Amino acid sequence: MMQLILNDAKKQKVLTDSSVPISPYNLFDGTSDFSGTSWTTLDLYTNDKLVSPFGNQSRQRKGAWMGLSQLKDLKVGQIYTISASVFVDTNDSSDKFIGVYGDDSKGNVISSNNKPLLYLKNAPVGWITIKHTFTVPKNATYKIRFESNDDQVNIHWADLMLNKGAVALDWNYSLNDLRSRLGGVKPSYRLYYAISLKEVA
C-alpha cells in the first residue's frame, strides 16, 4: 500500500493510497449549471443571479434540510471528500448551522454524520467553501449532501464537488460531463480530452 508522510511541526499524518486523490474529476454530474436528471430535491431550489467562485450557476433556498445531492455508489475502504461554495444571506440565527449528511436506503450513515460545519451566525459576507471528509460503513448507494437546520435563512449553493481522497479538490467537471462535451470541443483540443479521459477512466 502506498503511503505518504506529511511532516508538520505539530503532528505527523500518514496518507494511505485510499486518502490521496487519484483523479481530479467530480463524482457529481452537471454541477456547473445543475443540469441533468440525477439531482434530488432540485425542484425546491430557485435559480439566482449570483456567480460562484468558479464561475458556475448557483441555486438558493430558504428552508431546513432537503439538501442538494445525487445518488452515488460508494465503497468501504475508500476515503471521500465533499465540498461546496455557500453564500449565507444576512441573518441573526443563534445556534443553527450547515452540516453534512449521508445515508443509504437501509439507514447506514457516513462517518461524522450530522457534523456542524458552519454556524450561520459566523458566516462571512460572501462565498465560503465548506468541506467534509468521510468514509462509508458498507458498499451501497448513498445520498451525500450539505443541509441547514434553519428554515428562516436563505442560502446560496454552488460548486458541489465529490472526489475520492482526503483532500478537498478545486471544483471540476465530472468525466460524464466531459464525455458529453466532446462533440462540441474544437478539433485541436479533442486529443487532449481523449487522452485525459483514457488515463482516468
Annotate the PLM regions.
Residues 107-140:
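Extracellular carbohydrate recognition and processing domains
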Residues 61, 75-77, 123-125, 135-139, ...:
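Surface-exposed coil/turn segments at beta-strand junctions on protein surfaces, enriched
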Residues 98, 129-160:
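Extracellular beta-strand ligand-recognition surfaces/modules
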Residues 33, 59, 64-97, 130-134, ...:
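Extra-cytoplasmic beta-strand recognition segments
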Residues 1-38, 147-201:
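Extracellular polysaccharide-targeting segments
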Residues 56-75, 107-116, 145-147:
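Secreted extracellular polysaccharide-interacting domains
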Residues 91-104, 143-144:
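Beta-strand acidic-aromatic groove motif in beta-rich domains, primarily in extracellular
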Residues 41-65:
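Short carbohydrate-recognition loop motifs
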